[in-house]
Amino acid sequence: VRVLINESIISHCCWNGNDEIIGFFGAEIDSLNYYRLSIESCNTEKLFFDARKYSDGHPTIVHNRYIISDTYPDKNRIKKLFVYDLVKNDYRELGLFYESMSFFSYSRCDLHPRISVDNRFLFVDSVHSGKRKLYFMRSGICE
C-alpha cells in the first residue's frame, strides 16, 4: 500500500488508462478542482474546470479524452450533466435535471453518469420525474 496523494479533500476518482487517475481534490476549499494524477510519479496536473462552477461530480472517462461528469444541485435544484474534451479544452452540457427538495441528504440522487461499453449510450440515475429511475440517452461521443 502506497499513498498517492495526501490532500485534505479527495473525492470521486476514476481511472484514466492504467497509469493515471482523474479526481476531484485539493488542499483547501479554494484549491478544489479536477486533477490528473500520475500513479508512477504522483505528479498532478490541474484540469479545465473552475470548481465553483462545476462542483465535485462523479467523473467517468472515455478514450482517455472525454470526461463525463455531473454536478450537485444548484440553488434552483438543477443538476448538470456534461462532457469535457481534454484535447480541445471544450465543455458541453448534455442535460439539466431537476431534483425537488423532497430528495436531499440521504435520499438525494446523484446522476452517477456511466457509459456503455461501445460508448453509444450514457446512463444516469435521476429523480426529475418524482421517482428514482435509471435513464439512458445517446452519448453523442465517438459516434
Predicted regions and their residues:
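Short, solvent-exposed coil/turn segments at beta-strand boundaries
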Residues: C14-E20, I39-S41, T60-I67, I115-R120
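Long, low-complexity intrinsically disordered regions enriched in Ser/Thr/Pro/Gly
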Residues: V62, S69-T71, N89, E99, ...
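Blade-level signature of beta-propeller repeat domains, shared across WD40, Kelch, NHL, RCC1
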Residues: Y106-E143
